[in-house]
Amino acid sequence: MIRARHRRSRRWSRRPRAGSVCALVSGGLDSAVLVGDLLRRGLDVQPLYVRAGLVWEKEEIAALRRLLRALRSRRLRPLAVIDVPMTDVYGRHWSTGGGPPPGFFTPDERVYLPGRNIALLSKAATFCALRGIPSIAIGILEGNPFPDATPEFFRALAKGVSLGLDASLRIRAPFRALSKADVIRRGRGLPLDLTLSCARPERGRHCGLCSKCRERAHAFRDAGAPDPTRYAAGPAAGGPAPAGALRASAAARARTTRVAPAKATRVR
């Protein structure tokens, strides 16, 4: 019985395609540079966005599509979007609109979304097994304090999904030893102005008041690179951080930094 079930399962997973990789993408700096890096290595890249029902996803997907259009490469496959709803699990949580997002000075350890990488990678693994994609790349960085972002977790999960899907899958975190500033330096030449890293974006602009905006602004500063980001308000835009304020005022909108549209970037 066990052998018969094992033979039948082979119909569901495809033979691995050498030289192909699935990149988990969010539209932010890390995943943008990850895609560019994989393309430069000569790999066929399948970008995959996992939609979980979080408040920033509509703006994030729009930014991601603009970014991928600018990365002109024959090895870049069309964006795939799959759903792993988490709103029923998280309930009234800041990530689902149940409250304001973490403020500008909130430490990274306090913005954890429990089980997020487990949900993303489990469904991504099924997606890859059905298409013969042998590995998943994720843009985890140095210093990530969360339990589902460790090398031990990735090894254990890869082993589990490979066993459960009867497929040989790898989970790769090539930026695990890099800071966000390192990633920005690595991504010079890519249209990083098209990326979005904000917990409460406003019509394509970064709010400038959340912890994601702080992390982004500080990373450009630490990289010694000009920050092309349009911030609506707050310290990232060169202004104060209003206590409890998350919506940009009319004056803050007038101060928004504008950047010229990015030209398409050919990744060889």
What would you call each of these model-derived segments?
Residues 136, 200-206, 225-233:
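Charge-dense, low-complexity polyampholytic segments
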Residues 214-221, 225-259, 266-268:
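Short Fe-S-cluster ligation motifs
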Residues 2-190, 247, 256-259, 266:
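ATP-dependent adenylation/nucleotidyltransferase module used to activate substrates
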Residues 30-32, 143, 212-215, 228:
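Short, electropositive, low-hydrophobicity segments enriched in small/polar residues
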Residues 104-105, 190-196, 215-221:
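A polyampholytic, Gly/Pro-enriched intrinsically disordered region
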Residues 122, 196-218:
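Local cysteine-cluster metal-coordination motifs and their immediate loop/turn environment
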